[in-house]
UniProtKB/Swiss-Prot annotation:
Cellular compartments annotated: Cell inner membrane
PANTHER family attached to this UniProt entry: ATP SYNTHASE DELTA CHAIN (PTHR11910)
Membrane topology: Peripheral membrane protein
Entry protein name: ATP synthase subunit delta
Pfam families recorded: OSCP
Entry function: F(1)F(0) ATP synthase produces ATP from ADP in the presence of a proton or sodium gradient. F-type ATPases consist of two structural domains, F(1) containing the extramembraneous catalytic core and F(0) containing the membrane proton channel, linked together by a central stalk and a peripheral stalk. During catalysis, ATP synthesis in the catalytic domain of F(1) is coupled via a rotary mechanism of the central stalk subunits to proton translocation. This protein is part of the stalk that links CF(0) to CF(1). It either transmits conformational changes from CF(0) to CF(1) or is implicated in proton conduction.
Presence of keyword Ion transport: yes
Amino acid sequence: MADLSTLARPYAKAAFDYANENGAVNEWEDFLFVAATVVNDKSFSTWLDNPAVSAEHKSAALVDLYDTQVASANDSAFKQLLDATKGVRPDSNASYPKVSVAFSNFVKQLSEQERLALLPEVYEHYRRHKAVSLKQLDAYVTSAYPLTDDQRDMLQARLAASLNASVVIHESVDASLLAGVTIKVGDKVIDDSMRGKLQQLKTQLTA
């Protein structure tokens, strides 16, 4: 059976294409973020897996949660989380529209096809579509040691040139790499670490 990421791709593309054509890219991103956050919650996911709950009830619950917790005047935890993700100041009193009919139908379709569990992956793929459309990509760089400013600038410049897009680098450190880096952009992974090279050598020697 295909993994969740593969199953989510067509839904994410359909969602982004519709949102892009209708000038609602940011709104759909907000809707998907909250829906994905809810689905990732263990207690709620257990409820979603309950066959006794109808598909219509499940999708309606997700929509109602957004409308009452985010698109209302209430200062809820969901709204605070969305504000933080978007870089909105807590005291800005940012307002969000209610869920659109189109998004409500999208969630309903996922629910009827027993695909609500895909929402976190749909959200991630949607964000990638948005980044590509803006010519901006996220590069997740893991290195054995913290990058210096010069190394970071050089890596960012090389990635931008090879990908023909502006690149936002997200850094993490993993001492087990021994040396070098691993880079993940979308579904592509570049392993230029010493650990990776040793693993390749081991594979070649035992082949």
